[in-house]
Amino acid sequence: MKAFTQHTGLVCPLDRANVDTDQIIPKQFLKSIKRTGFGPNLFDEWRYLDVGQPNQDNSKRPINKDFVLNFPRYQGASVLLARENFGCGSSREHAPWALDEYGFRTVIAPSFADIFFNNSFKNGLLPIVLKDEEVDALFEQAEATEGYQLTVDLDAQTVTRPDGVQYSFEVDAFRKHCLLNGLDDIGLTLQDQDAIRAFEAKHQQSSPWLFGAIK
């Protein structure tokens, strides 16, 4: 998993509340269990004017020029600014996979759906909860200023505007540790691999009948 320490990036303001996971990555793209291949279909039903299908050549599809991700000024955005209850709906890890592969490192919103919030941390995407008035101020500035960037410092737990104004956010200490060090569940387990091997060796000596060949 990619570590997250500090990131400065272009902001894309998605001014919609209650964005659900089917809008983030529609159900027809969920057949794959690989983590890759979802970025091109992020917000597919909003980015395109037709119905997308897996493995389709998106370069030949009609683009919705009125959708914010298609605006030239937001190309290359890595900070997604959203409204309340982002990531609601059914549980699908494909949602943070799609956001991450598209290029977003963090999502800032007043609130998130619990399952999406948890899945994001496990997949290297930092969800940040700010106060309503702080999010409102960021929307106002991002929409008014082309090339608007924010700096997110996970260690300091701050979001810094171009004018130097900082907002603080809360994050669970364990989740913070995992993101700072790029540790997913497998990475955490591998930290204890020596102890696991020692236990297995000791267990095999004390209970050899459990390890005999099955005939």
UniProtKB/Swiss-Prot annotation:
The keyword Amino-acid biosynthesis applies. Pathway: Amino-acid biosynthesis; L-leucine biosynthesis; L-leucine from 3-methyl-2-oxobutanoate: step 2/4. It comes from the Bacteria. This is 3-isopropylmalate dehydratase small subunit. InterPro entries: 3-IsopropMal_deHydase_ssu (IPR004431), Aconitase/3IPM_dehydase_swvl (IPR015928), AconitaseA/IPMdHydase_ssu_swvl (IPR000573), IPMI_Swivel (IPR033940), LeuD (IPR050075). GO terms for molecular function: 3-isopropylmalate dehydratase activity. It catalyses: (2R,3S)-3-isopropylmalate = (2S)-2-isopropylmalate. Heterodimer of LeuC and LeuD. Its EC number is 4.2.1.33. It is an enzyme of class 4 (lyase). Keywords: Amino-acid biosynthesis, Branched-chain amino acid biosynthesis, Leucine biosynthesis, Lyase. SUPFAM superfamilies: LeuD/IlvD-like.
